[in-house]
């Protein structure tokens, strides 16, 4: 299967490496020193599951790759304006495009280029970091992707979703195919958008946030705001989507920092528009109040473009 990884950083690079390792025809789309390292030495994965080096094609542009069977989109959401047009040269009559981006806006944005009929939506649970150009380090063993159809008649489990699930499982990826891809995306978003907002606003990892009873209560209220937006949009998230969050948090190391907080502390751009901003805009359209998320959005929005310097806060 010809698979193109659009965004070959910590997440996309990891999954692409696993697919390449079992013989899939993978092309990484990357830039700069990371691109050069992949071309020269391959992509190194360091993991508790075992270290390995994946060797595959790597390109900066997509116009010479040709039609792909599958395109996996894993760029940061703030890069969509420049990255998503790179999908167009990869499209053939049977191309499938799977987005694994954070947030709930991605599938529509991808479909504006690829078409709804080609677009799948999904989310991933994994802890990886780009340690240096060409080197990705995994913490823990989670490597789960949950995905499915997000357009057309739902729920349904299509043949292409089943086929892609099998390809991923053969690469030792924990792939779950679902009948409505919107559900896992929103269920993760309920927690992620709130966590990223509180972590970014407080500059704290999850442990101190959760330990403070006032902060914890407002955090849960923020999750309920996001859940209300999901239901207003007709997404059938689980009835206990918020109630099960405390048990989930108890299993997370207290030192865990949201990726938005990491980016913020390094002076990088942050995904505030795709996370907190999306909740606010969708809530307004649906007539759902989101006062906590609106406050977090207002606090973080000035940092959207980053400061360009490490240690910024």
Q: Can you say where each PLM-predicted feature lies in the sequence?
A:
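NAD(P)+-binding Rossmann beta1-loop-alpha1 motif at the extreme N-terminus of oxidoreductases
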Residues: 1-47, 51
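Internal alpha-helical scaffold of NAD(P)-dependent oxidoreductase catalytic cores
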Residues: 37, 89-90, 113-118, 131-240
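Short, well-ordered alpha-helices that flank and scaffold nucleotide-derived cofactor binding pockets
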Residues: 17, 21, 85-89, 112, ...
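Rossmann-like NAD(P)(H) cofactor-binding subdomain of soluble oxidoreductases
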Residues: 51-136
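Nucleotide donor/acceptor-binding cores
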Residues: 1, 69, 143
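NAD(P)-dependent Rossmann-like dehydrogenase/reductase catalytic/cofactor-binding core
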Residues: 220-313
